Regions:
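Active-site beta->alpha N-cap acidic-glycine motif
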Residues: 24-118, 122-125, 133-151
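Bacterial N-terminal signal peptides that target proteins for export
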Residues: 1-9
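Acidic-and-aromatic substrate-binding clefts and catalytic sites of carbohydrate-active enzymes
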Residues: 36-41, 62-75, 98-103, 152-162, ...
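A cross-family glycoside hydrolase active-site/sugar-binding cleft signature
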Residues: 33, 57-61, 91-93, 154-156, ...
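His/Asp/Glu-enriched short active-site or ligand-binding loop at hydrolase and phosphoryl-transfer sites
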Residues: 159-205, 242-253
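C-terminal domain-boundary segment and adjacent tail
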Residues: 24, 56, 222-264
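N-terminal signal peptide c-region/cleavage motif recognized by signal peptidases
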Residues: 18-20
Length: 264
């Protein structure tokens, strides 16, 4: 156990240090984030990030993939391990991609998992159960990569309540939404929102400090956003003087991650 945990801590510390050096030379930072998806575009996303020397933050859930597997199964473990070795940052998206529906009057929450044995059913979770759901993704990440996950999470759909955020905070998790201009539109209809218009809008509206949101594959979009938009977006933003960093350097999360860089 000691042999697997210590290298993970060292790698996390090195990633934070590398991010600090990058941010120090950058006065117009952006924070590119990816939520899991059907994973069909994941290899191409990784190629673009490596070619452009961009570090991103990934939020992990165990989602259905194009070949009827799961995004955190054994097939994808080498892919996640390679991204971890490249110095990207990782947070939880809840293991079963669990949507918050409502706070319950007597305490706890109505939640709807997208995947898993209770998929598409509304289930009650108390604070401890929700924390365990967040931790499941972190545990699986460590199994796949030998590294530990950052104490960051993104609720599916960004749907939360003050009570849910407080419950997650009590067990050490910090929620990460996205900036309005950072919604890159890969979830939208490609007929109504073609890639060219999404790229134009992003280049026009994104401002320094924005958190950008994309996915590793969206089932409903017929003309995939990535990699068609991803690389011209990155190069276009760089031409405007922007640079990219992980959320370890975002002012909202930086101090918390330096104090507690990883989950147990």
């Amino acid at each position: 156990m000691q042999r697997s945990i210590v290298p993970g801590l060292v790698a996390a510390a090195l990633a934070l240090a590398a991010g600090s050096a990058q941010a120090a030379a950058c006065d117009k930072p952006l924070f590119l984030t990816f939520d899991t998806g059907h994973m069909g575009v994941a290899p191409l996303v990784a190629e673009v990030l490596a070619r452009q020397q961009v570090k991103a933050t990934f939020f992990l859930a165990n989602e259905k993939t194009l070949n009827d597997g799961r995004s955190l199964d054994a097939q994808w473990a080498p892919w996640w391990k390679a991204r971890a070795a490249e110095g990207h940052l990782f947070g939880s998206h809840t293991f079963d991609h669990v949507y918050w529906r409502a706070d319950r009057a007597g305490g706890g929450f109505d939640m709807r998992p997208t995947f898993g044995p209770q998929a598409d059913h509304v289930v009650r979770m108390d604070a401890a159960a929700y924390c365990a759901e967040l931790q499941r993704a972190a545990t699986r990440f460590t199994e796949m990569t030998g590294q530990r996950m950052a104490p960051l999470f993104r609720a599916p759909g960004g749907k939360t309540s003050p009570a849910l955020l407080a419950a997650a905070g009590q067990c050490g998790w910090h929620h990460v939404p996205w900036s309005p201009a950072g919604f890159l539109g890969d979830e939208l209809s490609s007929e109504q929102f073609p890639n060219a218009s999404l790229l134009q809008k992003a280049l026009r509206d994104i401002r320094p400090g924005d958190i950008l949101l994309a996915h590793l594959g969206i089932w409903s979009r017929q003309d995939p956003w990535a990699p068609a938009v991803l690389e011209p977006l990155i190069t276009g933003l760089k031409q405007r003087g922007h640079c990219f960093a992980t959320l370890a350097e975002h002012p909202t999360y930086r101090d918390a991650l330096r104090a507690t860089p990883t989950r147990p």
